[in-house]
Amino acid sequence: MDGFNPRATTVAEYMDGTPKFRTDLYASTCGQLLSHKEYMRVVDMYGLKFTPELKAPEVPMPFMGKYSQEQYAQQLIDEYRAARISPDRVFLQSFSIDDIYFWNRHDADYARQAMFLDSRPDTPEGARQATATMAQLKQSGIRTLSPAFHALLKLDAGNNIVPSDYAVAAKKAGIKLTTWSLERSGPLNKVRASGDFYYSSIAAAIKDDGDIYRVVDVLAQKVGVAGIFSDWPATVSFYANCFNL
C-alpha cells in the first residue's frame, strides 16, 4: 500500500509514511511496475484468474483531446482478446458505473462477471438510496456489486454482526456481492477509537484481532459474498480451507 506522512517537512519524512502495522521489508528491492500486458502473462502462466480494475484517470478525458474514457475501457478488453484469455477467467472492476454499461454494450462476453465498485453506501444517504434502488440497478445491467465491507454489515439490537439492509436488498434483487478490503485496518482493538473506515458500521462489536473471523464468517455465511478482496491472503485462505469454499 502507498503511504505518506502528512506532517512531513522534508522529502525523507514524507516518504516515511508506512503505517507501523505494515512492513517496508520488501520495498528496498526496487520492484519494477508491470504493464497490464505483463501482468496478464504472469497470471496466465500460473493458470489464475484476472481481476483488473479500470482505474479512474488522474487527467481530464479525453486525454490530449484524443484518448477517450471509452477507448480506455475498450483497450482493457482488447488486450484480453488479443491474448486469447477466456472471458470466464476475467472479473473486471470499476468505480464508474458507465464503464460497466459500456462493457455490457460492447463486450458482453467479458462484461458478464464485471463488478461495480460501489462507493454510494460510504455515506448514510448514499446507502439509503442504493438500498432503495437495487431492483432498478439489476434491470439496468449490473450483475455484481462490490462495496467496502462496512456497507454489507451492521449490528443488531444484541450487538451481533448481521447483514446490512443494503446486502439484503442486493441479494433479494438477484445481484451478486463481492467486497473489499480485508487486512487493511491495522490492529482491530484500535478501529473504534481511530474511526476506521472499513469497520465503521460494526466498530462497537470489534474487540481484538480474532474478531476478523467473525467478520469473514458473516460475510461468507450470512451475506453470501462470492469473494473477499484482502491485502493479505492468510485469513481468507484459512477460512476458505476450513469451510471447503
From Swiss-Prot:
Keywords: Secreted. This is Extracellular protein ARB_04177. It is found in: Secreted. Its main location: secreted. GO terms for molecular function: phosphoric diester hydrolase activity. Coiled coil: none annotated. It comes from the Eukaryota. GO terms for biological process: lipid metabolic process. It comes from Arthroderma benhamiae (strain ATCC MYA-4681 / CBS 112371). GO terms for cellular component: extracellular region. The keyword Secreted applies.
